[in-house]
Amino acid sequence: RAFALEGDYGGCEQVNRYIHGGEGTAQEAAAAIGFSIYRTEEMAELISYMRQYNESALEGEDLRFYGFDMQRLSYSMRFLKESCKELEVDTTNLQKLVEGENWSSECDLSTRTETLTQVKKELESKNGSENAIHFVDILMQHSELQTLTNDDGATLRDQFMAENVQWILQQEQRNGHEKIFVTGHNSHVAKWGSFDSMGKLLSKDAANGYYVIGTDFYKTHCNMPTRSPEKRTIQVFYSHDPLAKAAKLAGFDIC
């Protein structure tokens, strides 16, 4: 039972560890996902439920939490370093790539790619290194994404997300699970669009095996952060989709 979210891969691994008995709180786990939209009571409640469910789940029937985005650095780098130490792979050059939660200004794309490629080669010679190798892939995706403009970056991000969803599915299939649940914004999961979205790429590979349920609204209230990190505000939004308005006028109050 795999739940894959449009959230940072490393941050979602932190959630996965929490729901399997790891330290911290559900709120801290939700914050690790990376986007402010997930720092809600509802997400914390979902994570708490998953942890509670796993406490009594049969072996192989536990809930697993994945992320397929690559826009954050810190958690993936932290877990990669941990894995390297466990597998006795030197992290000296890896340490030089980062300053705090960002790439070091002294290391350009070429340097980062060279270092990460070398680490990946060393990991490939080790048994049980598959998850560590994927952390390298996520970091290489993040590194490349930082060098691109908005339009090019958006297209590449969806390509990377599609690749990451495929990787997640492969991990699950090896354990006898043929289906995963993927959630993300409509523009990413949709099979159609003006560019090669994640959903369009996945539907080409999976054909009828990729099933999408899109959601929309006519009017909604949204609790959003202001420029001050400690303050939030309630904003009202209306959908531009005529079908959403038609549903509202037809009496579907949920819209």
Predicted regions and their residues:
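Long, well-ordered, tryptophan-enriched scaffold segments
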Residues: 45, 49-52, 56-67, 71-152
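Alpha/beta-hydrolase fold catalytic core
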Residues: 129-180, 187
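Structural recognition of the beta-strand scaffold that forms the well-ordered cores
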Residues: 2-6, 64-67, 179-183, 211-214
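The substrate-binding groove and active-site-proximal loops of carbohydrate-active enzymes
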Residues: 29-41, 103-104, 110, 150-156
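Trp/Phe/Arg-rich N-terminal binding region typifying the photolyase-homology
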Residues: 1-56
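Flexible loop/turn segments at secondary-structure boundaries
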Residues: 10-13, 72-75, 187-192, 219-223
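Short secondary-structure boundary/capping segments
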Residues: 17-23, 78-87, 194-199, 225-234
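C-terminal regions of proteins
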Residues: 155, 189-255
